[in-house]
C-alpha cells in the first residue's frame, strides 16, 4: 500500500510539473487608477489627514506638461523646447487593502518618475529617487493599515538640469536630450506576497535582485538554462521549501522543469540556482523572436506560496570587427532607430499608455527595423518587452546627458546603472549596455565593468560608450565602438555599431518642390534652418546616409537612424515646433521617409514611389522609387517610362523628366528578371468629404482615466481616396465622458490641445483621454464646404475597488511569424581593413584649452573636425589624405593662450594648420607658416591651409585661435601632419 501511494504521489507530482503554475499568494495590482493631483506645492501634503478633496482626479501615466509641449517653434541651435512649466507638484492616492492581507509583504513599484520623487506612506517618508528613467520601489508593509484607508503621497519636481548650473547634478533632465515632462509618467504597481517570496528586481532601496536567467551551451539540439532565484524569508521561523522552475514555450507548454529542496533560514535572503535543459530549442532571432518564459514557484508542503515569471530568449551572437553582427550563425545588418525614452506625443507629452508605446514599436517593425538605441536614458519596461517580442537588438543606457560626470552626478548615474542591469538583465533583446553618452575616466570605466560583472556575469553582453574615441585609453575598457554619424572607425580592433546617424530634418507637410509648400520656403525663420528639406528629399537621402555610412561596409554591424518620431528635443529648424528628424511625425503619421526605409529594410521585395501623383498640368519632374529589388520599371498610365537597373546608394531608382499625366503611376520591382512586387499611385479627384477613423487599444478604450483613443481626420475625394494636397482648418466638438487632447501642426506654435487643427498633406490625427466614467463619446468634425462627420466611441468600464484593480495595462499580442531572408542585397564593396589610430608623429602632446582634444590618424573626406560638434571635412585637398591630425573642441574658437597646443615632432614632417578665414590670423601662424592658397571646407566654412616643415625632435607650440573678438559661428583651427618624404 505504501508503495502504491508513493507511485501515485509521484505520478501526481509529474502531472503538476507539466502544468504551468499560475496561482499563488502573490497579487500584482495596477496602481495607476484614481490619484489626486495638484500643480502646486502645499505644505504638509504628505500628511495622512491632509484634505485633497479639491485636487484634480487623474490616473497614471500622467504628466502635467501635456498642455504646454509641442507648442513653441524650435530655437534651432540643437536646443529643445524649454518653455514648459517646471516646479514642485503633489500626487496622493487613497487605497485600502483587504484585512486578509495582514501578514503579507506589500511593495510599491514605480516604473519611473520625472524627475525627483519623494515618496510617503501614511505620512512616513520612504525615500527619494532622482533618476527619472529607472524603476524603483519601496517596502510599504511596516506602515500599512490593513482593512483601512492608506495614503500614498508623492512629491515630484521637474526643475531643469543643466551642465552649467553649479551643484545641479541631474544633467540629463534637460530639454536638449529629454524634455522635462514632469510627473508619474509611467506605470505604478502594488505587489502583495507571502513573507516567504521571490524578491523583486528593484535594487534601489530594496536591495533585491529577483531572478537571473541565462542560457549556455546553445545549439539547435539543446540549451542549458540556468535560473538564479533570490528567495527571502521574513517569517519568524526557518522554512523548508521546494523551488519549482518551469520553462514554458510560446504555446504555453512546459518544455523543461526542475524541483530543488532548500532550507531558507528566518530573516535571510538566499540565491538558489537551478539548471534545466531544453531539447531542440527555438532560438531568438531578429526575424523570429521566439520567447519562452520561466515560471519560478515556491512550494511549502506541496502548497504554492509564491510565483514569479521571467522572460527568456535563447540566442548566440557575435559582434565581429571584420564581418559585423551574427546571430545564431546568421550574418545580418542591424538597422533601426535611436528613440528618446520620453517617446513624447503631441497633445499627450511623455505620459502614454503602454499600447501607444506598442503602437510606435509596431510601426518600427513594419518599416523593417531590427535595432534600437535608447538615447540617452533607459526605455520603459513595456518598451523593453516590445524589443523582445518584435526582435529589436537593443543598445540600452542607464541615465546620461553628454558629459563625463563627477561627484554627485556620477554617483546617481552609477547607482542607476546598477539598478538598470538588475531590472532588465533577463531580456534577450538587450545586447549592449551603454555606459554613457560620452567617454568616461578609467576609474568610472572600472566601476561600470564591475557592475556588469556583479549583476550580469553570464549575459555575454558588450559594453560601450558613445564617443569613447574622445579618450585613447577607452579601448582598454569598451568592447564595442559606438559611433556617431557613421564617418569614422577609430578602433580597428573592436566591432562597431552606429548610435546616431542622419540628423537631418523635414516636416511631413512639405511634399516636394513641385507641390504647394505651405509658405515653408518663405517662412521668416527659414534662413535659420540647418535643414531646408522637403519630405521627398528627406526620404531619398535616407539611402545615402544608410548605405554610405554603414550599409555597404561589410565590417560594420549597422546602426540607428536618429530618430524615429518627431519630438520637442534638440531641433535645428526654427520653422518647426519639433525636431523633425523622425520617419513619423509627433502623432506617428508616417512621412515618405518611413516608406523609403521600409522599401530598403523589409526582407520581402518592396517598391515605393516617393511622393504623390497630383501635379499641375505641364509638370515634369524627377521621380524616385525606393526599392530593395535589383531593377525597377516605371509606368505612367501603363506606358513604360523607363527601366533602371543601376540604383544610387543601393536603393534609389531615379527617373528623370517624368511628365505628369492625370491617372496612374506604377512601379514594378524585379529580381533576377522576375517580377516581385508593384505599387501604384493615382491622381485623386477634388476634395469631397471629411473622413474620421478611430484607433483604440487592442482591448478597446478603457475608462481608467489615462487611456487614449486616436482619431484620424482625412480629406477624401468622391471615391474615398485621400487627397494628398488637401490642407486647411478643421473644427471639432466633443461630447461625453472624455478629455480632449487634440494634436498639433508641425509648423504652427500653440496648436496643441485646441478644438481645431489644420489638415497636413491630406490627414491629421487627434487624441482624447478617458476619464473614470465609462460611456459614449462623440467627436464631430467640421470644415467649410464639407458635410459634418462624426465618430462615436465607447469607453469600457474597468473593475476597480478601493483604489485597486488587477486589470493590467494593455498591449498588442504579437503573432509570431518567421520572416524570410532578403531576396536581394545590394553588392557591398570589398572589405577595407581597419588602420592604426595611434600617432607616431605627435610626441608628448598636450592641450591646455577647455574641453578635450584627441590625436587621430588616416585623415580623409568625411572625418569629424571637432570633439564637440558633428562637423565634418567636406572638401579636402588630396595631399591631406592619410594625415595624422588633432581634433580639438570648437568651443575654444575665441580662447587665447600662448601654449594651448604643444607637441614634439616625432619625425621630420609637414605641419598643416587649417584656419577659419573669418577669424583674425594669430601671430604664430603669420610668423611661422606659409599660406598654401588651398582651402578646406567644414560644413560651409572655408578654412585656409597653412604649411611649414618641422624637424624631428622640434618643439611645436601653437597659441589660441584669436586674442580678439571673433564671429559667433567661427571655427577653431585644426592641425594635420604628414611624414616628410
Curated annotation (Swiss-Prot):
Question: Which residues participate in Mg(2+) binding?
Answer: 561-563, 581, 583
Which GO terms of type biological process are on file? carbohydrate metabolic process
Q: An example Gene Ontology cellular component term from the record?
A: periplasmic space
Q: Name one GO molecular function term.
A: metal ion binding
Q: Which signals induce this protein?
A: By ulvan and rhamnose.
Which Gene3D superfamilies has this protein been placed in? Galactose-binding domain-like (2.60.120.260), Glycosidases (3.20.20.80), Immunoglobulins (2.60.40.10)
Instruction: Report the locations given in the UniProt record.
Output: Periplasm
Q: What broad class of enzyme is this?
A: hydrolase
Q: Which UniProt keywords apply?
A: Glycosidase, Hydrolase, Magnesium, Metal-binding, Periplasm
In terms of InterPro entries, this protein maps to: Beta-gal/glucu_dom_sf, DUF4982, Galactose-bd-like_sf, GH2_Domain-Containing, Glyco_hydro2_dom5, Glyco_hydro_2_cat, Glyco_hydro_2_Ig-like, Glyco_hydro_2_N
What job does this protein perform?
A: Beta-glucuronidase involved in ulvan degradation. Ulvan is the main polysaccharide component of the Ulvales (green seaweed) cell wall. It is composed of disaccharide building blocks comprising 3-sulfated rhamnose (Rha3S) linked to D-glucuronic acid (GlcA), L-iduronic acid (IduA), or D-xylose (Xyl). Beta-glucuronidase removes GlcA side chains present on some O2 residues of Rha3S. Can remove the GlcA side chains from polymeric ulvan or from smaller oligomers.
Protein family per UniProt: Belongs to the glycosyl hydrolase 2 family.
What is the name listed in the Swiss-Prot or TrEMBL entry for this protein? Answer: Beta-glucuronidase
- Tell me the classification of the organism that encodes this protein: Bacteria, Pseudomonadati, Bacteroidota, Flavobacteriia, Flavobacteriales
Amino acid at each position: 500500500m505504501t508503495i502504491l501511494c508513493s507511485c501515485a504521489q509521484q505520478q501526481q507530482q509529474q502531472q503538476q510539473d507539466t502544468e504551468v503554475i499560475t496561482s499563488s499568494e502573490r497579487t500584482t495590482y495596477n496602481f495607476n487608477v484614481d490619484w489626486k493631483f495638484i500643480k502646486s506645492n502645499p505644505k504638509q501634503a504628505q500628511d495622512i489627514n491632509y484634505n485633497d478633496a479639491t485636487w484634480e482626479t487623474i490616473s497614471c501615466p500622467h504628466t502635467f506638461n501635456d498642455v504646454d509641449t509641442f507648442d513653441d517653434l524650435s530655437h534651432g541651435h540643437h536646443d529643445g523646447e524649454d518653455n514648459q512649466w517646471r516646479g514642485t507638484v503633489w500626487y496622493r492616492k487613497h487605497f485600502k487593502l483587504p484585512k486578509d492581507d495582514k501578514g503579507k509583504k506589500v511593495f510599491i513599484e514605480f516604473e519611473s518618475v520625472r524627475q525627483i520623487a519623494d515618496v510617503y506612506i501614511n505620512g512616513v517618508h520612504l525615500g527619494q529617487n532622482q533618476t527619472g528613467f529607472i524603476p524603483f520601489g519601496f517596502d510599504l508593509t511596516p506602515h500599512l493599515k490593513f482593512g483601512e484607508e492608506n495614503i500614498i503621497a508623492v512629491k515630484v519636481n521637474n526643475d531643469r538640469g543643466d551642465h552649467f548650473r553649479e551643484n545641479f547634478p541631474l544633467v540629463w533632465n534637460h530639454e536638449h536630450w529629454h524634455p522635462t515632462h514632469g510627473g508619474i509618467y509611467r506605470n505604478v504597481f502594488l505587489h502583495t506576497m507571502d513573507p516567504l517570496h521571490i524578491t523583486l528586481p528593484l535594487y534601489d532601496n530594496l536591495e533585491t535582485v529577483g531572478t537571473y536567467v541565462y542560457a549556455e551551451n546553445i545549439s539547435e539540439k539543446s540549451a542549458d538554462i540556468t535560473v538564479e532565484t533570490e528567495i527571502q524569508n521574513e517569517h519568524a521561523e526557518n522554512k523548508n521549501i521546494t523551488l519549482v522552475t518551469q520553462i514554458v514555450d510560446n504555446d504555453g507548454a512546459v518544455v523543461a522543469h526542475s524541483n530543488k529542496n532548500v532550507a531558507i533560514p528566518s530573516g535571510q535572503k538566499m540565491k538558489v540556482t537551478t539548471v534545466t535543459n531544453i531539447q531542440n530549442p527555438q532560438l531568438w532571432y531578429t526575424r523570429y523572436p521566439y520567447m519562452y518564459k520561466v515560471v519560478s514557484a515556491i512550494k511549502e508542503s506541496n502548497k504554492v506560496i509564491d510565483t514569479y515569471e521571467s522572460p527568456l530568449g535563447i540566442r548566440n551572437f557575435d559582434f565581429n570587427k571584420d564581418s559585423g553582427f551574427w546571430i545564431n550563425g546568421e550574418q545580418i545588418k542591424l538597422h533601426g532607430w535611436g528613440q528618446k525614452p520620453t517617446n513624447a506625443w503631441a497633445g499627450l507629452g511623455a505620459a502614454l499608455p503602454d499600447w501607444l508605446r506598442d503602437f510606435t514599436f509596431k510601426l518600427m517593425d513594419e518599416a523593417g527595423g531590427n535595432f534600437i538605441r535608447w538615447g540617452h536614458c533607459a526605455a520603459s519596461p513595456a518598451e523593453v518587452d516590445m524589443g523582445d517580442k518584435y526582435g529589436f537588438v537593443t543598445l540600452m543606457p542607464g541615465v546620461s546627458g553628454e558629459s563625463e560626470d563627477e561627484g554627485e552626478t556620477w554617483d546617481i548615474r552609477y547607482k542607476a546603472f546598477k539598478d538598470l542591469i538588475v531590472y532588465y538583465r533577463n531580456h534577450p533583446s538587450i545586447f549592449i549596455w551603454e555606459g554613457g553618452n560620452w567617454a568616461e575616466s578609467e576609474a568610472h570605466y572600472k566601476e561600470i565593468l564591475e557592475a556588469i560583472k556583479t549583476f550580469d556575469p553570464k549575459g555575454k553582453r558588450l559594453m560601450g560608450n558613445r564617443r569613447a574615441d574622445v579618450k585613447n585609453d577607452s579601448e582598454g575598457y569598451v568592447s564595442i565602438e559606438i559611433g556617431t554619424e557613421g564617418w569614422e572607425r577609430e578602433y580597428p580592433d573592436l566591432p562597431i555599431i552606429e548610435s546616431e546617424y542622419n540628423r537631418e530634418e523635414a516636416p511631413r507637410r512639405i511634399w516636394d518642390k513641385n507641390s504647394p509648400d505651405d509658405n515653408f520656403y518663405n517662412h521668416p525663420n527659414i534662413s535659420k534652418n540647418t535643414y531646408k528639406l522637403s519630405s521627398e528629399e528627406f526620404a531619398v537621402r535616407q539611402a545615402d546616409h544608410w548605405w554610405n555610412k554603414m550599409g555597404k561596409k561589410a565590417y560594420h554591424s549597422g546602426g540607428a537612424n536618429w530618430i524615429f518620431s518627431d519630438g520637442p528635443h534638440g531641433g535645428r529648424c526654427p520653422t518647426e515646433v519639433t525636431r523633425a528628424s523622425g520617419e513619423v511625425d509627433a502623432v506617428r503619421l508616417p512621412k515618405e521617409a518611413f516608406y523609403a526605409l521600409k522599401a530598403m529594410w523589409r526582407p520581402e521585395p518592396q517598391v515605393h514611389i516617393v511622393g504623390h501623383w497630383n501635379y499641375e498640368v505641364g509638370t515634369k519632374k524627377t521621380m524616385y522609387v525606393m526599392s530593395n529589388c535589383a531593377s525597377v520599371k516605371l509606368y505612367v498610365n501603363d506606358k513604360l517610362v523607363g527601366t533602371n537597373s543601376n540604383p544610387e546608394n543601393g536603393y534609389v531608382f531615379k527617373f528623370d523628366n517624368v511628365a505628369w499625366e492625370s491617372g496612374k503611376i506604377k512601379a514594378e520591382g524585379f529580381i533576377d528578371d522576375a517580377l516581385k512586387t508593384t505599387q501604384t499611385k493615382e491622381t485623386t479627384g477634388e476634395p469631397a468629404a471629411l473622413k474620421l477613423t478611430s484607433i483604440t487599444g487592442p482591448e478597446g478604450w478603457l475608462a481608467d482615466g489615462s487611456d487614449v483613443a486616436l482619431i484620424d481626420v482625412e480629406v477624401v475625394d468622391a471615391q474615398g481616396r485621400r487627397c494628398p494636397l488637401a490642407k486647411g482648418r478643421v473644427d471639432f466638438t466633443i461630447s461625453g465622458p472624455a478629455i480632449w487632447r487634440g494634436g498639433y501642426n508641425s509648423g504652427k506654435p500653440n496648436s496643441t490641445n485646441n478644438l481645431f487643427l489644420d489638415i497636413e498633406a491630406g490627414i491629421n490625427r487627434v487624441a482624447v483621454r478617458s476619464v473614470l466614467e465609462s460611456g459614449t463619446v462623440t467627436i464631430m468634425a467640421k470644415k467649410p464646404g464639407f458635410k459634418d462627420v462624426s465618430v462615436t466611441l465607447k469607453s469600457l468600464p474597468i473593475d476597480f475597488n478601493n483604489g485597486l484593480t488587477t486589470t493590467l495595462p494593455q498591449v498588442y499580442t504579437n503573432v509570431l511569424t518567421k520572416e524570410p531572408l532578403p531576396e536581394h542585397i545590394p553588392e557591398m564593396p570589398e572589405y577595407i581593413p581597419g588602420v592604426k589610430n595611434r600617432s607616431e608623429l605627435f610626441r608628448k602632446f598636450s592641450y591646455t584649452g577647455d574641453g578635450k582634444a584627441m590625436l587621430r590618424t588616416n585623415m580623409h573626406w568625411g572625418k569629424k573636425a571637432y570633439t564637440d560638434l558633428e562637423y565634418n571635412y567636406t572638401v579636402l585637398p588630396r595631399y591631406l589624405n592619410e594625415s595624422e591630425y588633432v581634433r580639438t573642441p570648437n568651443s575654444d574658437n575665441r580662447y587665447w593662450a600662448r601654449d594651448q597646443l604643444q607637441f614634439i615632432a616625432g619625425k621630420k614632417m609637414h605641419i598643416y594648420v587649417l584656419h577659419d578665414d573669418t577669424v583674425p590670423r594669430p601671430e604664430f601662424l603669420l610668423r611661422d607658416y606659409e599660406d598654401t592658397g588651398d582651402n578646406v571646407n567644414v560644413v560651409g566654412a572655408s578654412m585656409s591651409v597653412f604649411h611649414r616643415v618641422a624637424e624631428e625632435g622640434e618643439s611645436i607650440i601653437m597659441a589660441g585661435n584669436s586674442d580678439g573678438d571673433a564671429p559667433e559661428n567661427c571655427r577653431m583651427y585644426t592641425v594635420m601632419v604628414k611624414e616628410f618624404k
